């Protein structure tokens, strides 16, 4: 979950794709190769696991956010599922990892009030705008790492993405009777894949 007005754009707040050990080191992941951790950002690192090891790892995130602007202050506390993954050896030179993790999160509710002026009569009317959104994208991946030479491994991840992002925009005139209100809702349903 998230409470950020910046998630109004694009896919929302992109999730950190690194796992526990990498996050503890500031998000570094591409150069890490360790047989005791899962590193989906470097699928070649899967081959570091030994034949007697099976890794099952999960994570959650806690977030405390302070937002201020225009004299308004907001404190938001969020918790969310981070990832669930496993890694194991298939062959002395081949290892595999499978996992589920969020790709992006959308969550916002922003309102403001403006004044509109009729250019013909000069009459004014207040109107309010509300922007809300929720949802996000999820990622399921399966990756293979192959040890080609003693000091050379290659790897690939195949990922499937799915999810919905709902956005609503409402404009209404609370002080004008008989005024037409504007309501627009968009739902983006995503179903796609990638190789990396």
Task: Map each language-model feature to its residues.
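Subset of outer-membrane beta-barrel
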Residues: 1-196
